[in-house]
């Protein structure tokens, strides 16, 4: 469960919304939608504990440490950093106790699962946008966090990559994890995500995604 009470976020002295209250049930799958500049990505950072709210609080039903995984937008990653794809993905083992053999087997399985086999030693700068995004998603897959925050996870993915992404999102949801997904593709939200949180400068609305999208036919999201 993610409960936000009296929450305001944004730059100091410049809140993006008035104080809002909403609760995302444990095991729910929710899209965050809204126009450019309404603070969708910032909201995920506040929930993740990476950005302080201007007011209010976020309460989780599990300890934050080790219980939450956050997928940021890939433009925040330094692609000049001298590591390989395999090393990037293996960073997802942080805090997980496994034997070297267990790690090796799990890493190999995850790389194959995200169609990254054969790219293990490729440096970040040599990866395509889609390959890098799948690597970041593979890193996320190594953890078993009950709460997953995904900021535009479909970015840079081709049609095959997006199908793979939604397959995993549905699998994580079926496992009972709580997922919050920033997504600008309303057609994908309507098809794959049952609930949506619409953010406007006037506040937030939480409702079934089909209902919200139908009521907001001209909503531009990104």
Q: What are the residue ranges of the model-derived segments?
A:
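Helix-to-loop junction immediately C-terminal to a conserved catalytic motif
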Residues: 48
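Conserved ABC ATPase "signature" region
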Residues: 102-119
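Conserved ABC ATPase signature
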Residues: 123-127, 131
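Catalytic Walker B motif of ABC-type/P-loop ATPase nucleotide-binding domains
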Residues: 148-152
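Helix N-cap at the start of a conserved alpha-helix in ABC-type nucleotide-binding domains
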Residues: 159-161
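H-loop/switch region of ABC-family ATPase nucleotide-binding domains
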Residues: 183-184
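H-loop (His-switch) and adjacent beta-strand-loop-beta switch element
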Residues: 194-210
